[in-house]
Amino acid sequence: MGMQLSDIDLLNLDRFTEGVPHDWFTYLREHAPVYRHPEPGSPGFWVLTKHADVTLVGKDGRTFSSDQANGGVVPIEDISPANDADFGDAKLMLMTDPPEHTRKRKLVNHGFTPRMISRMEDHIRELTTELLDGTIAKGECDFVVEVAAELPLLVIAELIGVPVEDRHKIFEWSNRMVGSQDPEYLTDSDKVLEAQVEMFMYAGALAEERRKEPRDDIMTALLTAEVDGDRMSDMDFNLFFMLLSVAGNETTRNAISHGMHAFLENPDQYQALVDDPSLIDSATEEIVRWASPVMYFRRNATDDVEIRGQQIKAGDKLSIWYASANRDEEVFEDPFRFDIRRDPNPHIGFGGGGPHFCLGANLARMEIRVLFEELVRRVPRVESLGPADRLRSNFIAGIKHLPVRFHSTA
């Protein structure tokens, strides 16, 4: 007997420890691309799995709200007020709609200019070179912990002025907040809120220091930015620090981890990059498509709307699944093949445009590109020493551990 809709349970986190359930998404794209998924104690939520629909909803912030008051972007389940942090009137930028989101985004854009990001490439390459040389010399490593997690932490520390020796505080805070349903990081809601408080206190101290001693860096640019007489409040800055520390760390870490895992499973593609390093730009885009590190975002309908014949009512919850959209057979030829020459590659691994397009997309691309450029330059072959250990989450497509051996000769 074949698969049925009743077999699909996207709230079963244990299933995600085996990998992204692409068999479920393939079935949904074909048989129920807009599907009302059951949820205990609620009317359920809509699951959108097609590239076109995910893109449509992601771009229409008026009809499909990200506002925290309407449920925010994550999780699918509604959060009890007792387990939610109280930020007063301030909200994470991800959890706002225009015009508030537009205001926040304009302020933040003062720090994330192309000039600011491009200025970092030489330094990111230095950090990458030092990191890889030390790790490769050992011969074997846990690629996630020692490489994929380290580089974004080093970059974020540089970006927002965190002393290098404090970078693992970000790693710990991030794991507590994103991995709270994984046995390795398992913690209760109090610990998640504790991590938020610790991050806010740390961000506040950094901001105070930078106001006293401004520098030509992104943090100073953010704190001094002014748009239409509006400046970033202390709470806005704290929330942005948290967003950058968690989102900027987790997504890049997992894109790099999935990239390495894909190369291990497709050694011909790694060899192709060794032989022709000019493929690095298309390889970077394929890594992001393949990884889809953020599997879904949630939205809430503000109006009645119809999608593919399904009647979605105002107030209904929707989940838009990037992990599925990036394997859509109507958009990608042979979507389950990891192909570093893929062209075109209209993936939506960074959100697919719209108001919530990933602010750090260019920085993430740079980190992925530089790391694999420098890796293939040094190591002609990488060997897997064991399976990928995956995060217990239906939100972040995370790999926690990936043991590898580096071979200096092919």
Description of each model-found segment:
Residues 1-410:
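Cytochrome P450
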